[in-house]
Amino acid sequence: TSTVLLQVLRLGLMALAVGWAYLFVDAWRLGQPLTLQRQHRLAVVGVNGFLCFSVAGALLFGAHVIGVQRDFMLSMFGDGKAVGAHHGRYNVLLMGGDAGAGRWGLRPDSMTVASIDAETGKTLLISLPRNMQNFPFPEGSVMGEQFPDGFDEEGMYLNGLATWALDHAELFKGSKHPGVDATIEGVEGITGLEMNYWAMVNLEGFKDLVDAVGGVELNVRQRIPVGLPHDSFFRYIEPGTRTLDGMDTLWFARARHDSDDYSRMARQKCVMSAMLQQVSPQVALRNFEKIAGASSAMVSTNVPRGEVDRFVDLALKAKSQKIATLSLVPPMVNTANPDIDEVHAKVAAAIAKAEGRALEKTAEATAEATAEAAEGESAETAAQTAESPAPEQGAAPTPAAPVTPSAPPAVTGGSVGSLSTGYAANQSEDLGAVC
């Protein structure tokens, strides 16, 4: 990922290609082809030409690919300072917003914290609703000084922080992205987590990325509208397991017609999970140039170039593990007046569970309870056996109760669950299983 090393390697391959071509031309000259018979001369020229252009062409193509990677690294990532893991985890705020006129980076439609174990890559996705209100900011932060009692402005929500910050950019001295900085401070106040990095995804450009990898396979549980009823292209994605192109994947992730914000958040998580699981290194290598072009136009981030290798390694580790999710949405959280202490406790518990710490405690408690219950059941069974009369010989056995088939899970807006009971993909220990 070193741009200097990539440039040196690129120039080296180009020089090697020129040198290789010169070597074959010189070998052809030393062979004195004009002294050979016509057929032999044509054969020698053909073999030399094939070897010259094939080898030199391969080297030049390699130089081109390296040049694409270098340009991608320069345009996508900065040269900022690396930030170490907080309590063994990297917390990255992922934001999605429209690229329409006057909207890029202003009002993110979706906000998700990817909390990643620095050793194992085990990932917890913490989603925040855009309509969250009445939340605090970290002590000493810019927004904390402006709103010491929390963000309680009438009609202002979490996704409005960026707009407020851009209107008061003078408060964020030296910041290139005041809207992002304000949003990060809000997310840190809500979750109690300190962010390492952030990434802003242009949702319109997301279509090109999906097309670059050949589409994504998703389980469509209900008809999902593409566009709005008044759009000329309005149609539906029909139910079933389908490979969707960029346009359909984008609408699968963001459609709200006949749905709600929280069902949409659940579908967005399913898209994230599918992309992580289905985009293999082989697919990425095969479509590298397309992916690089789409990604550099789609994502703005403060992840430094020196950290890219680390996050690629963590992503490869995450592919083989279950992704856990936590969404700070109803019915678990009152978005209009959240209990922040309770939210912090739920975030801490979800991280502990993802790391296995909660499971270890639960296993110990379960083992103790099972042992105590087994002792009690043994004594009770012995007493019942002594008191119960033996069954008469030849008596018919008592028929077992019929098994009642379980009802299929409710599906609302294309997601398992409902607004009143919550959506499975929003609170899950295995995101892939509920999608």
Language-model segments: what does each one mean?
Residues 15-25, 53-60, 309, 322:
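Alpha-helical transmembrane segments
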